[in-house]
Structure formats: C-alpha cells, structure tokens
Amino acid sequence: MTAFRRPARSAAGALVAALAVTAIAAPALAAPTADDLAVPRYAHVFVIVEENKDYAQIMDGANAPAIVRLAKAYGSATNFYGEVHPSEANYVALVGGDTFGIHDDDAFFCMPAQDSGDCSHAKTPGYANHTVDAPHLGNQLEAAGLSWRGYYEDIPAPGSLATFATAPGGEAGGPNAALYASKHSAFLNFRSAQNDPHRADHLVGFSRLDADLASGNVPSFALVVPNQCNEMHGAHGPGIPADCDWNDPSATIRRGDAYVDKLVRKIQASPVWASPDNAAIVITWDEDSGTRVGCCGSDPASAANFGGGHIATVVVTNHGPRGVADPTPYNHYSLLRTLEDAFGIRTYLRHADDSAKGVVPMLPLFRR
C-alpha cells in the first residue's frame, strides 16, 4: 500500500486555504434555463461509477442483463460521453466541472517535475498539478446546507490518503493488482477535500454504505465506487480472480453487472426509496475503451473535453419516469449540472455552465 501524508497545518492556515479556493475559482453565475428550473428537487441521488466499457459492450445485453433491464424499465441516456482519457480526470470532471488539465492517472498529490513512483508522468511538458484549488460539488452542497459522501469499496480506512490498497488479507501488489485506487476518488484531487477536517466522514467504505442504507440516514449526494474487480475495470496479477482479469472484458462486465444489480437492490430496499421524497440512482462509466468521441463542445484540442468515448448511463428513480430512452447528447458535465439543479443549486461549476455548447440538464430522465 502506498500512502501520502501532508504536513500538519494550523487552523488559520486551513482557513486561508479554504478562502483562497473560493476566491480563485468561484463558480460562474449563470441564469438557469427553463429546463434547469423544471428539474424536480431530489432528496437523495446515488451515482454509481463503473469503468472503461463502450456503450455497446454494456447495452448489447449479452453480459450485462441486469443493467439493460434497469435501462429499459427506468431510463437510459443513449448518447452519453466521457470527457477525456484515462480515468482520473473523468471523475474529477463529474464533481468539479473540469479536468483541470489532468490527462493521466497519477496520484492526486502529484505536481510538475515531482520525483515519485506515483507521479510517473510528472516530467511531461504541460503537466498539471493534480491537487486542484477549486470548489467541487461537495462544497456546493455544504454551502446549501446539504450533505455528501463518497463510498469506496476496500478503502483502507475512512478518510484514507492511500493511493492504492488491497482488501484486508488480500494479495499484496502494486497498482495493477489493487482493489482500491484513489484515482477513482474524484474528491481527493481537490485541496479542500484533502484538508477537510471531516474527511473521515466524507470518504468512507462500503460498511458505512450498508449502515447508512439500513438506517435511512444517507447523504443528499452519494458517490458509490466499487473496487476494481466489481467496477468492470479489472486487475492483473497473483491472486486475481478469473472474472476480474482485465484481459477478459466479458467476464469483468458480467461480474460488474451482478454487483451493480446487488447495489441497486440494496438501495431500493432502503427506507429512502419508499419515501415520498424523490430519490435517484445513476449508473454511469468514466470512459469507454479508448475512442476519442464526445459531445457538448468536444474538441480534439480541448484539455477539458477532447472526447472520452460513448458510454452507457442509466437513471433509476423512485417516483420518476419509466421506460425512457433519451437520445439527447450528454456528458459528465451534463450530469453535474443536473445534480446541481436537483439540489436547488443555481450556480454551475465551470464546464457544467457550458449551455451554449450543449451542456444541458438530463430533464427527461429526472422529471416527475
């Protein structure tokens, strides 16, 4: 396991840093559109993120019958795209509205020219600081008096700053054999999350997810990230199960599909699903297998959106529409904008504000 620890800082220093984030990168004030205003308020939204699969690999149904069943019964965004490759920046885009120039899977603490095995691309020209001084969705929610939490299967401990980790008692190994990977955290790339005094309550494991669902005490926004065997990413090395080997994508899809089905059923069995309040589960992917197609302002020269491929995205709601196949072009910025609307936040983070480029809320899938 590789871990990173920052030096302790004073309370005054933490306050100055927090104020700097707000001052440097406050979200643009944009007038919401009629569609933004039409998105109903949601009490709870769970976003489950899977990995590295093309739209057709999932939606042809051969290896993902549970996900296809959910798509047909509830709703599917049939033209949804990632922003870039590889994984890490798409997670950052989902909660921050930008890739911030990150175009690799180096650790969240990496800086230009840094000598570290976790920062293998750091001497590449134009390398971006992987710790971002900008607000994220969690900051917006807290400012609105709402709650958020990231649930990560096999995170070593609540609030952990480990870059990779195996499950307790699991096989030792490096990144290729890791079950938990901080590159899929989304939030840890933000300085405010790294320095969050409540980080151990905001970045937690799946035992906390089980407890929260059983009690019904779940946050407004929940990012749910299975381990690399259960999110279709796969792994490679000694002790890796056959259905987790990334050289067998059909097997990793079947395993991930069964796991997503279990997660969705668990959420639907929670008291929050039976509530009169609106709740939703979004199942999406970070990127496809490597194509550079995109939407909503995608440009080969864009650091924020050069195209992360056509990916499946399914929206399951407790009170919303049924049987919807929505062909509107969307990406993770569209999903972020939809989340902001659903929680009554009318300021859109960075590229979530790109309505002129086609970044619009996913209203047909969330309307009631």
Language-model-detected regions and their locations in the chain:
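Secretory targeting and sorting signals
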Residues: 1-30
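N-terminal pro-sequences and low-complexity stem/linker regions of secreted or lumenal proteins
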Residues: 30-368
